[in-house]
Amino acid sequence: MDRVSSLPDELLCHILSFLTTKETALTSLLSKREIIPLIKSVVFPTLIYASFLVQLVSKLVKLKIGSGIDLCWWTESIFLPMLKTLVLDSVEFCVARFEILFPACPALEELEMANIKVLDSDATVSSASLKTLKIDSSVGSGSFSFDTPNLVYLGYSDFVAEDYPLANFQNLFEARINLVVTKDQIERARAPNNGWLEDDEDDIALRLGIRKSS
């Protein structure tokens, strides 16, 4: 007997909140009732369950992807219109896949990226709805741009990028910046007649268009 199908939505949502992503996926297969749209928050520990659920969940509000997942599986067919919070932890992606992620999340307000590996040279965070952005220890070899006109909070702890071509922070209220300069960047900065400035937090703040408080 399928008892899951007879449960009220509120009770079923409460029960699902205690299950792992794997258990939720298995429950959806065993039940005659479509329970995937009831899920509000999901953590994807492995790629197999990520690709399975992301294509089905249209009402997802919070999503966390981690554990070394390669985001190259993300396709233009994925659309998460209600997603408010996205956490990317220890994932890899190419720039082409990363850039189609934002149009797929038109309501995204909070983005956290930790231990990210960018496979291509340049990357851009572009979102008109984004209000909170936290970046911690991403790995890339090129420039990093911000096209986030409604961003209110920026937390940026990382190595200095080669360049910041675009820094759209029209409504930024608070920024916490903690950056590390590589040995190669220091050597180039110290070279005679070199126009590449030695980066520090003040310099990066100016390049990003952020006025630091005294």
UniProtKB/Swiss-Prot annotation:
SUPFAM superfamilies per record: F-box domain, RNI-like
One Pfam family linked to the record: LRR_At5g56370
Protein species of origin: Arabidopsis thaliana (Mouse-ear cress)
F-box domain mapped to chain residues: 1-47
The protein's name in its UniProt record: Putative F-box protein At3g58910
